[in-house]
């Protein structure tokens, strides 16, 4: 198949129901795929996508990040996009969370007891936690008044926290993720932050 097709867009409808950018492009596809495709007419093919869907609400997330009201409306979008849009998962799509933040230091204390470097970093945490983490107050969190939090992961890392009842830094086993700012890698770091007046 040695067909050099021009880049001029002159769509044609092929007998396979697909629209090709040009008759040459259709012939090249037929040659490469070793099938017979003939031109039905000039211009794009008419899609036979049925938009007759019920108003049932059963949200479906498409691969385009759009939440469709039900499987039928997603199927319609799939048909209109020539299969570009497909089913991703049941339920609404999650909003895309920002991922790029500046390095400015403008500390923000989150409701999870963690200090975030700036408002953008807190917004990312808020988005990724589906709104469970929000702003507690501007500025750094008071790590020393927070309760010890092991976190949901199953690692085993030796860490230290300040126990406000005993007034001392105590050892604990940290799971490796989650947790809060009352989590120090060394006893010395804990004592310097929480015990020195």
UniProtKB/Swiss-Prot annotation:
Q: Where is the BPTI/Kunitz inhibitor domain?
A: 144-194
Q: Which GO terms describe its molecular function?
A: serine-type endopeptidase inhibitor activity
GO BP term, pick one: cell differentiation
Cystine pairs annotated here are 1-31, 5-24, 13-45, 49-79, 53-72, 61-93, 97-127, 101-120, 109-141, 144-194, 153-177, 169-190
**Per the record, where is site Reactive bond 2?**
55-56
Under InterPro entries, the record lists:
Kazal_dom (IPR002350), Kazal_dom_sf (IPR036058), Kunitz_BPTI (IPR002223), Kunitz_BPTI_sf (IPR036880), Prot_Inhib_GrowthFact_Antg (IPR050653), Prtase_inh_Kunz-CS (IPR020901)
What the entry lists under SUPFAM superfamilies is as follows: BPTI-like (SSF57362), Kazal-type serine protease inhibitors (SSF100895)
* Swiss-Prot/TrEMBL keywords: Disulfide bond, Protease inhibitor, Repeat, Serine protease inhibitor
Q: Where is the Kazal-like domain?
A: 1-47, 48-95, 96-143
Q: Where in the chain is the site Reactive bond 3?
A: 103-104
- Marked site: Reactive bond 1: 7-8
User: Hey, where's the site called Reactive bond 4 on this chain?
Assistant: 154-155
Question: GO cellular component terms?
Answer: extracellular region
Q: Which domain of life is it from?
A: Eukaryota
Instruction: Tell me the function of this protein.
Output: Inhibits trypsin, kallikrein, subtilisin Carlsberg, human leukocyte elastase, porcine pancreatic elastase and chymotrypsin. Two domains are for the inhibition of chymotrypsin.
Name under which the protein is recorded: Four-domain proteases inhibitor
Question: What organism does this protein naturally occur in?
Answer: Melithaea caledonica
């Amino acid at each position: 198949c040695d067909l050099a097709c021009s880049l001029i867009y002159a769509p044609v409808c092929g007998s396979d129901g697909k629209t090709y950018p040009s008759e040459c492009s259709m012939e090249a596809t037929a040659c490469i795929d070793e099938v017979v495709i003939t031109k039905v007419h000039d211009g794009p093919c008419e899609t036979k996508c049925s938009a007759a869907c019920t108003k049932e609400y059963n949200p479906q997330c498409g691969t385009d990040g759009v939440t469709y009201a039900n499987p039928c409306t997603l199927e319609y979008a799939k048909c209109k996009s020539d299969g570009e849009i497909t089913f991703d998962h049941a339920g609404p799509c999650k909003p895309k969370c920002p991922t790029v933040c500046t390095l400015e230091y403008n500390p923000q204390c989150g409701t999870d007891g963690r200090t975030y470097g700036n408002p953008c970093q807190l917004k990312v945490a808020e988005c990724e936690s589906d709104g469970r983490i929000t702003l507690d107050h501007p500025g750094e969190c008071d790590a020393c008044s927070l309760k010890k939090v092991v976190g949901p992961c199953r690692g085993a890392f030796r860490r230290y926290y300040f126990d406000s009842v005993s007034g001392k830094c105590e050892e604990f086993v940290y799971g490796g993720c989650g947790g809060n700012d009352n989590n120090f890698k060394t006893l010395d770091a804990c004592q310097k932050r929480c015990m020195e007046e």
